């Protein structure tokens, strides 16, 4: 694996934050051949540091320091509310590096200001990244070179699929759609399981049927050339069982409520940029 950053003679990568998303990326990088000795993690919690060291055999530290000078890339896998403090502690050591943020809400101009560099890329992944099946959207500031983008892609592809955005504001919509999206799917799976048990199935049976249906339908939607509304129409015969269910949903305004809920998520993503990025 080669990061190909123009001002670095090595492939060292540092993670600020060692939670689930960082662990998913680290695991993917190791599987793709990046030596553990070229990865370091800054993680304030001792339990997390012990887990990371044992699981991945990577270098772990409690706080940022001069060791960050080695990093060709720094991945910011911190909570939005702790980003600023972490950035201020690290700034003196990471000005030369390419920066990839997976923190929700914090805008790239804010990150660039905190770090004193314009080589910043934002990513919005989602939790299926934990098993390499995630969907991420990326936005790069103009100072990020083509080589920087390629380096980011090599990291992000360890989490699953990705796409690039032309406008950073679109990341708020991405957060509402795919970033929070897995929770919506789990919510509907919960409802299907509950309905199944209320109709006489065991919980195990309902769980297997509900999850299997989402997996199969998602695979079909991904492979099909037709849009989802066509696929839905094909299995909806007027007067049939599917028709009865969808008619009930439409009469209850479920689609409109769902869209409204996603708008609320987008609005909250925008607010987080103001709230946690305020000077």
Model regions: which residues?
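NAD(P)-dependent Rossmann-like dehydrogenase/reductase catalytic/cofactor-binding core
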Residues: 2-3, 7, 211-279
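Short acidic capping loops at alpha-helix termini that bridge into adjacent secondary structure
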Residues: 36-39, 96-97, 119, 204
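Internal alpha-helical scaffold of NAD(P)-dependent oxidoreductase catalytic cores
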Residues: 110, 114-119, 135-173, 186-223, ...
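Short pre-catalytic strand/loop immediately N-terminal to key active-site residues, enriched for Gly-Thr
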Residues: 120, 170-176, 228-233
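Rossmann-like NAD(P)(H) cofactor-binding subdomain of soluble oxidoreductases
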Residues: 26, 46, 56, 64-138, ...
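NAD(P)+-binding Rossmann beta1-loop-alpha1 motif at the extreme N-terminus of oxidoreductases
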Residues: 1-63, 114, 197-198
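Small-residue helix-packing motif on alpha-helices
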Residues: 39, 67, 202-209, 231, ...
